[in-house]
Regions:
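Beta-propeller domains
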Residues: 23-42
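Conserved strand-to-loop turn within each blade of WD40 beta-propeller repeats
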Residues: 24-27, 69-72, 110-114, 122, ...
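Beta-strand-rich domains and repeat architectures in extracellular enzymes and scaffolds
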Residues: 2-28
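WD40-repeat beta-propellers
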Residues: 30-35, 75-79, 117-121, 159-163, ...
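Canonical WD40 repeat/beta-propeller blade segments in eukaryotic WD-repeat proteins
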Residues: 6-14, 51-59, 94-103, 136-143, ...
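Structural hallmark of WD40 beta-propellers
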Residues: 18-22, 63-67, 76, 85-87, ...
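Terminal intrinsically disordered, low-complexity extensions flanking WD-repeat/beta-propeller proteins
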Residues: 10, 179, 212-225, 231-233, ...
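Short C-terminal beta-strands that terminate individual repeats in beta-propeller domains
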Residues: 1-4, 42-49, 85-92, 111, ...
Length: 353
């Protein structure tokens, strides 16, 4: 299924419970579609959300509102039913807002082009944490929900771990050779996987973030802009060459290609109900959002993975297994950032949510 968005798109997000998908466009517009398996998606809303591009899009409050971020440094909350603005924070960040993710039912995190990460509490209606975690743009973030630690990646080539309970940067990796573009937590919290500009997947062991414990180079030289976790052993990767692949983690292997998004980069991935995946490309002459039903394909891939694992177990070579002892934490690390900033302009941002 392919949808002509009319303009270059930067981000997408599925509704948590309804058949809705939102998209943020280069002209600052926010689009909302209803989709189904037997008909073309229907556009429900078109809102001019920002004066500059709409880089980040997320459903919040159980899907009742959509939060968007922009290079104009603002964050906007829009009502899903009416399309009306609920609240706008004009100076949410000092630099362009590049990424927004959900943390809990009442908190979200936003990252900007200056390396700053902020956590917003919709219940307390304020910014509750601020971390100057990086020196370049925030490319991606994910939450370890059991420990309430926020993992972030950046164009400066480092990975950070922010402790939300203690309000400090707990760990930071050494500089890698190229930009880190995407991140997921795998293996029941024991591994962190990062996609990089060179196409190498960097695997970090939890608690040993100084340097990666393993590298997977089979996707090189095409940068991995998007990572999507399917389960604790498999991820979907979106690469610069437009290829979407199913990849196994420890043992590391490309299980199979899933789809090809023409010859243009895949820069965002999202999934809903473990069977529908939406892929969006971000080039000036690509204005399409594609949706696939991968239910049968993923079931076949699971059987393929089990067969491959059984064969390798019989070989007993263990070449792909991460059995090396993690390196000791050494080297320079940047100091923890200042604690939650009391931004007066943000105190009532979520007042109407």
């Amino acid at each position: 299924m392919e949808v002509n968005l009319g303009k270059l798109a930067f981000d997408i997000d599925f509704h948590p419970s309804d058949h809705l998908i939102s998209a943020g466009l280069i002209n600052g517009d926010l689009l909302l579609y209803r989709y189904s398996a037997d008909s073309l998606p229907q556009r429900l809303l078109e809102v001019h959300a920002h004066t500059e591009s709409c880089r980040a899009v997320r459903f919040i409050n159980n899907g009742r509102a959509i939060v968007t971020g922009s290079p104009d440094c603002s964050i906007l909350a829009t009502d899903v039913e009416t399309g009306s603005a609920i609240a706008r924070l004009e100076d949410a960040h000092g630099d362009a807002v590049n990424r927004i993710i959900n943390l809990t039912e009442s908190t979200i995190a936003s990252g900007d082009d200056g390396g700053c990460i902020k956590v917003w509490d919709t219940r307390q209606r304020s910014c509750c944490n601020t971390f100057q975690a990086h020196e370049d743009y925030i490319s991606d973030m994910t939450l370890a929900s059991d420990s309430m630690k926020l993992v972030g990646t950046s164009g400066d080539g480092t990975l950070s771990v922010c402790n939300l309970r203690r309000n400090k940067i707990q760990a930071q990796s050494e500089y890698s050779e190229d930009e880190l573009l995407s991140v997921v937590i795998m293996k029941n919290g024991r591994k962190v996987v990062c996609g990089s500009q060179s196409g190498t997947l960097l695997l970090y062991s939890w608690g040993h973030f100084n340097d990666c414990s393993d590298r997977f180079i089979d996707l090189s030289p095409n940068c991995v802009d998007a990572l999507l976790k399917l389960d604790e052993d498999r991820i979907i990767t979106g690469s610069e060459n437009g290829l979407i692949s199913l990849v196994g983690i420890l043992p590391n292997r490309i299980i199979q290609p899933i789809a090809e998004h023409s010859e243009y980069p895949v820069e965002r991935l999202d999934v809903v109900a473990a069977s529908i995946i939406s892929i969006m490309s971000r080039l000036s002459f690509i204005k399409f959002m594609q949706i696939w039903d991968l239910d049968d394909l993923l079931q076949d891939s699971g059987r393929t993975l089990k067969r491959q694992t059984a064969v390798e177990d019989s070989d007993g070579d263990g070449m792909d297994l991460d059995i090396n002892t993690p390196k000791s934490n050494k080297g320079t690390k940047r100091q923890s950032a200042s604690k939650g900033l009391g931004l007066n302009s943000s105190n009532d941002f979520f007042a109407d949510l």
